Structure formats: structure tokens, C-alpha cells
């Protein structure tokens, strides 16, 4: 009965625990493939119904992105001229001075390109002086090397950063397209910004020029603390649910499981005590034998262990005997040249036994002769 109760209890605990552990292991979603399928389905639904009002979960984020795998939230709008409102848990991060905190455009040294670039993030860096040559949609530009009065656009700014890398989604990028004409006369200049999380940086952002391809595509790296992910409400809810689930399992194990088995055990022992009071011969087995009675497998392994111990002890005894025989104990030898083989030893012991029998017979004869002398004296008298 106790074994059956224990099996029922363990099966109930496993049925409750396994789904929660699977949920914790897979994170906010069921799997990476399910998250990607859900994201693609969401994109198709948005393209199919562009006029349909979007819910709070499906709204387009301005210069921000939510990681579909971890549920974390990254807001790059703090680097633009129109930042979003801070969410719960976000802190206002400013530079060392007011100018740095209000900075919305950056001048980047073009190493090896003999010019400087001016960039904006999710906004246009074009001011009044540049508005005559460039559109207010321009996200990045530079001064022409041949004509300093000529400004060249390398892409219109975008407000939709993207996470690339498949199921891992580790790279955060932002593309600027539809710039000035490339030297080939067919394509237009474009820019790719790669964002890197940097919590040690002192300024809002640090932009570095990486290189270009055919003077048509330009690559930059943006290091900023605003590129670091923050917690999301959904993620916090998931963590709270996991905590509640663990507490529920602990409650079931502690109060429902352990105490139920303890009550069953006490009831069983009380019944055994009653039977013992009625007839002591019916309950000769101690209570701890009922509890510690193992399964067949445990008995099998215990038997193997005992057999191994016996074999080891016998082997050690044989080794000790062999060592004593090699070291040479106290032996009786008939002559110095006696052999140490077993056959010689047997012959030696046989000779010794024969000698002992002869000595015993001599002692018996001597006793008989001594007893005969008084009778002869009496006869003479």
C-alpha cells in the first residue's frame, strides 16, 4: 500500500511539474520556430489589412523594437529628435552636459574617405543651411570631395530598426535608403547602421565609420546604452507566473504530498500495533522493515555488492597466505637440503608422524615393564 501511494504521489508531482519546467525552458514563447511563425503571420496579416485598426500589441513602434524571442524592449528613439515617452522601468539617461543630452545629429570622421559624415538616428540631421540642397527626409549626408559646396545624401532616415540573426536575433540594424545616385548611374546610395549595447559609454551614442562598398553603400557602428534591452511587461508577467508556479509546486509537495503520505504511514502503523496487541505472533516484523523494504532492483544490487565484498575478502586472505608462505614461517626440516615443494613437505610430515608413533609405543612399553617389576619381587619373597 505504501509503495502504491508513493507512486501515485510522484506521478501527480511530475504531471504538475513537467509543463511548468517546459514553459520555463522555452521562455516567453513555445519555441524559436513558433515565434518566427507568429511574427511572419503577423506581418502577412498587417499587409493584408492595412486599414484595420491595430491593437496595443500590434502597434508600430517608433524607432523601437521588441525581441520576439526574449520579449525584451529596445528603444532607440532617445537618440532621435522626437523621443518616445519612457515606459515603466526605464530611466532617463543623459550625457555629461545639456548639449550632449539634447544632441540629435552626429559628425563622424570618415577615416580613409577624406570627408566627414553627418548622421541622425530615426530623424533628419538637415538644418536650415543644408535644407536648400537636401530634403528633410535625409538621414545622413557628407560633403562632396570634389566640390565642397555640394552635399551628397547617403539615404533617407528610417524609424523601423530590425533585429537580424534568425532565431537568436542578436544584431540590431537600421537601414537608410533612397539617397543620391551612385557612381554607376543605376543605384542610389544607402546606409546601414549596426547598433551595439554599451553600458560603459559616457555619452548618448558613439558612431564610428566602418567602410563603404563601391562608393554606394556605407556602414557605421553605433555604440550606445540605448541599444541595450530593457524588461518588458510581458516578460515581467511571465516571471511572476513562473514564481507562482514554483510556489504552488512547493505547496503541493509540502502540505498535500508529504503530510498525506505521513498520515497514511501513521494509519498503517497504528493498524499494525492493534494487530500486535491482539496476536504478537502476527506482527513480528519491525516497523522500520516495512518502511525500508526495498524493491527487487535494490535487493538485486545489494546482493551483487555483498558478493563482491565476499570475493574481495577471500582474495585478500589468499594473498596474505601466499605472502606468509613466501616469507617463510616456522618449519621442521629433516635435513638442510630438504626441498620446499609440497610433495617433500608431505613426506616430511609423514616421517614425523611415524616417528611420533614409534615414540608413543616406546613410552607404552616402558610403562608396562615398570609395572611388572613388583610382581617379580613378591614371588621371590
Curated annotation (Swiss-Prot):
- PTM-bearing positions, type Phosphoserine: 335, 339, 342, 371, 380
Identify the keywords attached in UniProt to this record, alphabetized.
Disulfide bond, Endosome, Glycoprotein, Golgi apparatus, Membrane, Phosphoprotein, Protein transport, Signal, Transmembrane, Transmembrane helix, Transport
Tell me which residues make up the MRH domain. 61-230
Regions of this protein lying in the Lumenal compartment: 24-236
Signal peptide residues on this chain, from the entry's feature table = 1-23
- InterPro entries documented for this protein: Man6P_isomerase_rcpt-bd_dom_sf, MRH_dom, PRKCSH
PANTHER family registered for this protein in UniProt: MANNOSE 6-PHOSPHATE RECEPTOR-LIKE PROTEIN 1 (PTHR15071:SF0), MANNOSE-6-PHOSPHATE RECEPTOR FAMILY MEMBER (PTHR15071)
Assigned protein family? Belongs to the MRL1/IGF2R family.
Which protein, by its recorded name, is this?
A: Mannose 6-phosphate receptor-like protein 1
Instruction: Recite the lineage of the species.
Output: Eukaryota, Fungi, Dikarya, Ascomycota, Saccharomycotina
